[in-house]
Amino acid sequence: MLFSPTLSSPLTPSAVKIERENLKQFELENFSRYSIFELIENRCDFYDALLIQLWQEIELSEQLGIALIAVGGYGRREMFPLSDLDFLILVEQTPSPEIEEKITQFIQFLWDCGFEVGNSVRTLEQCESEGKQDITIATNLLEARFLAGNRPHFDALNELVKRADFWSKEDFFNAKVQEQIERYQRYHNTAYNLEPDIKYSPGGLRDLHLLYWVALRHSGALTLEAILQSGFIYPQEYQQLQESRAFLFKVRFALHLILKRYDNRLLFDRQIKVSELLGFRGEGNPAVEKMMKCFFQALHRISLISNLLIQHYRENVLPSNQDTVIDQLDDDFQLINQCLCLRNSFVFQEKPARILDLFFYLTQYEHANIHSDTLRQLQISLDQLSQKLCEIPAAREKFLRLFNQPNAIKRAFMPMHQYGVLTAYLPQWQAIEGLMQFDLFHIYTVDEHTLRVMLKLESFLSQESAQEHPIAHRIFSQLSDRTLLYIAALFHDIAKGRGGDHAELGAVDIADFAQLHGLDRREIDTLAWLVKSHLLMSITAQRRDIHDPEVVMNFAEAVQNQVRLDYLTCLTVADICATNGNLWNSWKRSLFASLYEFTGRQFSQGMKELLDYSEKSAENRKLAQQILMRDYSDITPISIEQLWARCPEDYFVRNTPKQIAWHTSLLVDFVEALLVKISNRFSLGGTEVFIYCQDQPHLFNKVVSTIGAKKFSIHDAQIITTQDGYVFDSFIITELNGELVEFDRRRELEQALTLALQSEKLPALSIVPNRQLQHFTVQTDVRFLQENKKEHTQMELVALDKAGLLAQVSQIFTELNLNLLNAKITTVGEKAEDFFILTNQFGQALDSQQREILRNVLYRNIG
């Protein structure tokens, strides 16, 4: 043993606790000195020595018909600092009261030492009956390892679990694979989550265990080395599995050393500490990102190889009653029972461009899979490539052809990524494989996100997308050639992790790719522009005032034409949806639809003059009046005009006809001082909070503090002041998950806002610490946008999205006598990116001195 514990005799819980702590200290101090396998072996030896000595001291060793057997992870000698001690006490018959007392004493002692114990006491007959009913028990028994007591009794258990009538090889295989399917579904079939589980995520240790269990049930192979010697895996597969297993073991061991309670999730705070223990260096996030890149690559290799071997077992080892049906596809490929097979094992080595044809055939035969033997030949060939596939002219032609095939992304590009073909084709791809960004915004690694963007684009073809993404569905369905958009998606983030502007660098990469693949100058320019500008629409829609004609003109000038607008819209929507499933909601849909509509109008009108919103205002007035005349018989045109005469022109542009009609119906005969109404019916994409009252100090502060205290997300705020000093304030809110607000919650918020606005006191800031936010730092940035407007100032604020931030900002505005006209609230993971339109107390734009004072106060208070 590396560390020899001093186990006193007789054993005492306090002495064992001291030795456990000494062992942990030894492991912390020597973590980088010894291999992870030595550390795990050493810990297992310590447990064995402890349990065997305890067994003897309690005099259980003197009982002839009883055996102590390690099972589960302890049985396979896979023990980490916080692993459970799983063991079976195998008895010949129901224990006598005396033996039962000794067994209780044995288990109680381990509990007193602080161990988490997973124990069972069974007869051989009980092992058989319970094991037959429960695959988990059967699996535990399969990994049984003798520790002490009656050896023949243990041997009898071993013989039992090998019998075909206990669990047949086929039934055992199918049950374990079904467990894996259900586990993958719990993790959304991806290993690339922000805070992954080392054990249970796809590609995690459970995938390795599945491989062990199948091999153990089939041939009795106890270790990865034994599986190699049996010929079931190739040497290169063994090497990759061994390296990946070692890395996951190191991460899990380090995680257990820093925790006090058992857990296998790599939460954000733990990622930082584990990366330090593993020796990853770098200021701030890079160390974590380097470690997680290695981690995700290990998961990918384990998932790929273990699933390939499971498929190999099903296809080549398990019996099949299926008649063989062979379709010859060409000289090199054939379809055998819907499995793509090579007719010659050396096809890929001799003609590497034919690798792309394998995936072409996947798109042509929607029910086909790739045979495991073909996949193994593919892996061998990829390892032997002397150049990137894109350097082969025939491969380039085949690669471009794939984009126009049915279900090209799902059937070709997803498998190409899974099996390493994209890495073999694109020089830049390997750098983004497993690359994560240590933030709350990007929940997938860059490579996984990229494929999800492409898959989302492909989904726009389905009729199901017409409701959720009507504009993208219409555009994408009408494109005669979708190749350019797919290529733009493939490259939009390809330069991440290099330093510098990834959009600028990616534009260079995609231009080189397009030129190499023979695209014309127009296509090259379009692709380079799309990658360089892929964030433009997102920034404009979410962080600019899209009702400002200058904003629309600037955006239209950058986009240049309707074709590019269509491309950019599809790419932007797909990018947002594939970044984080919670980001897209009905509010964002309406926001992007408005920008798309305004920009289209600008193109139709021409680029010489700003978009004329008077036409939009008149149109909205007309439609709102039609709604009022249709739905509210007691409202007269005269009363409508009297109310509308108080409102600035801006009001009729920034609100939809439904909103205007709703506001009007509420106010046309309203004579009281305060009105708060909340509805889901009239605002596109969110729940609207409408407030009418006389303007008052701290109004915005009171509203956002109250909304925040009730745990809603604010997406947009409009402050319209009438000519007689009243405000028409509209806030678009949702639940934190992006859903509309239900009736009871709306009534509750109405009451809270009414009380807050009637009170002279400011609401107390409700600050609930966020576990995830504690581990991130965001550099506060205050930026004033350059514009020539004298009537207002536009400001961007980037800061950590801590609780009460918006209320804190609004309080600063009040203290500096600033008026807020409009706000857009955007949360990007842990980061708030907010946009405000302000005036000073005289209703004018802020001068340079006022801007500098505001900047300094924000920095000082927000940090």
Swiss-Prot record:
Catalytic activity: [protein-PII]-L-tyrosine + UTP = [protein-PII]-uridylyl-L-tyrosine + diphosphate; [protein-PII]-uridylyl-L-tyrosine + H2O = [protein-PII]-L-tyrosine + UMP + H(+)
InterPro entries linked to this entry: ACT-like_dom_sf (IPR045865), ACT_dom (IPR002912), HD/PDEase_dom (IPR003607), HD_domain (IPR006674), NT_sf (IPR043519), PII_UdlTrfase/GS_AdlTrfase (IPR013546), UTase/UR (IPR010043)
EC number in record: 2.7.7.59, 3.1.4.-
Region spans: Uridylyltransferase: 1-328
UniProt activity-regulation remark: Uridylyltransferase (UTase) activity is inhibited by glutamine, while glutamine activates uridylyl-removing (UR) activity.
Cross-referenced SMART domains: HDc
GO biological process terms, semicolon-separated: regulation of nitrogen utilization
Cofactors, names only: Mg(2+)
Molecular function terms from GO: [protein-PII] uridylyltransferase activity; phosphoric diester hydrolase activity
ACT domain span: 688-772, 794-863
Domain notes: Has four distinct domains: an N-terminal nucleotidyltransferase (NT) domain responsible for UTase activity, a central HD domain that encodes UR activity, and two C-terminal ACT domains that seem to have a role in glutamine sensing.
Function summary: Modifies, by uridylylation and deuridylylation, the PII regulatory proteins (GlnB and homologs), in response to the nitrogen status of the cell that GlnD senses through the glutamine level. Under low glutamine levels, catalyzes the conversion of the PII proteins and UTP to PII-UMP and PPi, while under higher glutamine levels, GlnD hydrolyzes PII-UMP to PII and UMP (deuridylylation). Thus, controls uridylylation state and activity of the PII proteins, and plays an important role in the regulation of nitrogen assimilation and metabolism.
The name this protein goes by in its record: Bifunctional uridylyltransferase/uridylyl-removing enzyme
Gene of this entry: glnD
